[in-house]
C-alpha cells in the first residue's frame, strides 16, 4: 500500500524564508518519512528552494522518498522557483537517491573540527598577535555596534564571490536591517554570536569579518559561520588573522567548549589552507545537489 502523504505548514515563517513540510505514514498512521522545503524570500534568492528528505531505513527503496520528493517539487514549481538545492553526506543513501532522480552534483564540501583540548594554542596566539599595518582588530557579541553597522553590512559583499562552483545560490543582499535580524535570530534560539572584524585604520570601516556561534551553555562545539575579506583588501593574511583571533576568544570566553566546526567548499583552496594551518581536522564530506526546474 502506498504511503499516505500529509502536507504541513510552518507555524512561524521567518522574514527571510518560510517552510513547507510533508509527512509520510504507513497504513497504521506510523510516520516513516518526511520532507521539508525551505522557500527563500529575500531579494536575490526568490528563485531558490532548499530541500531535506528523510526516510526510515526500514522503509527505503519502497517509493516513500520518491512520493515525498514529488510533493516538494510540485510545491516549488507552484511557487515559481527555478532551482532546488539539497545537501547530503557523500556516499550516503541520500547521495544515491538524489543522483538517481535528476539532481546534479554542483558542490563538494569538507567538514572539519578543531578539538580545542588538542589545539596548538601557542601557534594560534602567534598568528593572532601579528601586526598588520593599516589594519586593526575588533570584536563584539550579538548585534553589531551601531557605529560599525553600516560598513559591516557593506562588507558582507565579501561573500559574493565565495567559490560555489555551479550552485544557483543567487546573490544575498545585505543591509543593516538584515544584519541585525540575523543576530536576533541566533539570540532568540539561545545561542551566542561572536564576531571578529578587521577595520581599515584609514577610515575605520569594516573590511573583513569572521563569525562564530556558540551554544548558550558554552559547552559542546561552536560553529563557524562566515569568514570573508573584501576583494580590495585580500592578500594580507587577514582571513587567517581573524580566524586565529576567533579561536583564541572562544577558548578564553568558553573554557568548557569542546571544539569548533567549519565547512568549506573543496574549490576554496585558500580557506582550506587557513583551516589546515590552524589545526582543523576533516571529519566528513558532503555534496550539494541542484535540481533545475
Show the residue positions of the predicted features:
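Conserved beta-strand-loop-alpha-helix junction that forms the acyl-donor binding cleft
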Residues: 60, 85-94, 230-234, 260-272, ...
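Conserved acetyl-CoA-binding loop-helix of GNAT-fold acetyltransferases
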Residues: 55, 61-74, 99-100, 229, ...
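Conserved catalytic-core motifs of GNAT/GCN5-like acyltransferases
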Residues: 39-42, 85-89, 104-118, 276-293
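Conserved N-terminal entry element of GNAT/NAT acetyltransferase domains
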Residues: 1-10, 118-146, 150, 161
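A conserved beta-turn-beta hairpin within the catalytic core of GNAT-like acetyltransferases
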Residues: 34, 40-52, 59-60, 215-225, ...
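Conserved GNAT acetyl-CoA-binding A-motif
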Residues: 76-89, 250-263
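Conserved GNAT-fold acetyl-CoA-binding loop/helix
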Residues: 1-14, 160-181
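Conserved beta-hairpin
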Residues: 7-10, 18-35, 193-208
Amino acid at each position: 500500500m502506498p504511503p499516505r502523504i500529509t502536507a504541513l505548514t510552518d507555524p512561524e515563517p521567518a522574514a527571510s524564508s518560510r517552510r513547507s513540510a510533508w509527512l509520510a505514514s504507513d497504513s497504521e498512521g506510523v510516520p516513516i518519512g518526511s520532507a521539508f522545503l525551505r522557500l527563500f524570500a529575500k531579494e536575490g534568492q526568490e528563485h531558490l528552494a532548499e530541500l531535506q528528505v528523510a526516510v526510515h531505513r526500514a522503509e527505503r527503496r519502497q517509493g516513500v522518498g520518491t512520493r515525498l520528493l514529488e510533493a516538494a517539487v510540485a510545491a516549488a514549481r507552484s511557487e515559481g522557483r527555478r532551482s532546488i538545492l539539497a545537501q547530503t553526506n557523500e556516499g550516503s543513501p541520500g547521495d544515491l537517491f538524489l543522483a538517481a532522480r535528476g539532481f546534479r552534483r554542483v558542490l563538494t564540501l569538507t567538514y572539519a573540527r578543531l578539538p580545542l583540548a588538542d589545539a596548538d594554542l601557542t601557534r594560534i596566539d602567534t598568528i593572532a598577535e601579528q601586526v598588520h599595518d593599516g589594519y586593526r582588530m575588533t570584536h563584539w557579541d550579538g548585534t553589531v555596534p551601531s557605529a560599525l553597522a553600516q560598513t559591516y553590512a557593506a562588507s558582507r559583499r565579501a561573500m559574493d564571490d565565495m567559490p560555489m562552483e555551479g550552485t544557483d545560490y543567487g546573490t544575498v543582499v545585505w543591509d543593516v536591517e538584515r544584519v541585525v535580524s540575523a543576530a536576533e535570530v541566533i539570540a532568540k534560539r539561545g545561542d551566542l554570536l561572536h564576531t571578529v572584524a578587521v577595520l581599515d585604520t584609514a577610515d575605520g570601516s569594516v573590511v573583513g569579518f569572521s563569525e562564530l556561534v556558540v551554544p548558550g551553555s558554552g559547552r559542546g562545539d561552536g560553529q563557524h559561520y562566515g569568514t570573508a575579506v573584501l576583494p580590495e583588501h585580500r592578500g594580507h593574511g587577514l582571513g587567517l588573522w581573524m580566524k586565529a583571533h576567533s579561536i583564541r576568544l572562544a577558548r578564553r570566553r568558553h573554557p568548557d567548549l569542546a571544539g569548533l566546526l567549519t565547512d568549506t567548499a573543496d574549490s576554496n583552496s585558500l580557506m582550506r589552507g587557513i583551516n589546515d594551518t590552524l589545526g582543523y581536522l576533516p571529519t566528513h564530506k558532503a555534496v550539494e545537489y541542484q535540481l533545475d526546474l
